[in-house]
Amino acid sequence: MSIRVWAMIETARAVLHAEELAAASRDSEMRLAGFVFGPNDLSRETRIRMRPGRAAMIPMITHCILATRAYGLEILDGPYSDLGNTDGFGQECAQGRDLGFDGKTLIHPGQIEACNAIFTPPADEVTQARKILAAFERPENASRGAISLDGQMVERLHADMAKRTIAIADAIAARAH
């Protein structure tokens, strides 16, 4: 059994070298599974003020997400510190999900349920994902790169995205039982 490690990205240098760090995952000795974005330490070091919406931090976030995706790694969003602001927490989780984070690090048990709900694919999205996969599995579509489904063009890349959505939903459902 190999223990996997996660790299904290919490300094300006780490952000600037995110691609090099992610590339190191190709070395089997590194055992790098992904990054954890550290907004609080990064804010301190860069003097960026932590504001709702994190506008000033978005370029750094997307840079790190691109680096992880280029090398097939996962990335988790950092913690949300305002424990009393459940609306703000939910908004930041949704923003992180929409930006491409795979999840969020949490600092209080009260954050688990809301975070899981936000990062869990909605039922309608899972239904659509299953429909996309079923359409591409039909013999007449087996060699096609794109098809028409419910009046929309759907490419094979959407089938790949659908597989991921279903895998996440199935993994979450399995843990619930």
Model-inferred region functions:
Residues M1-H177:
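Expand to "…catalyze enediolate/carbanion chemistry for C-C bond making/breaking, isomerization
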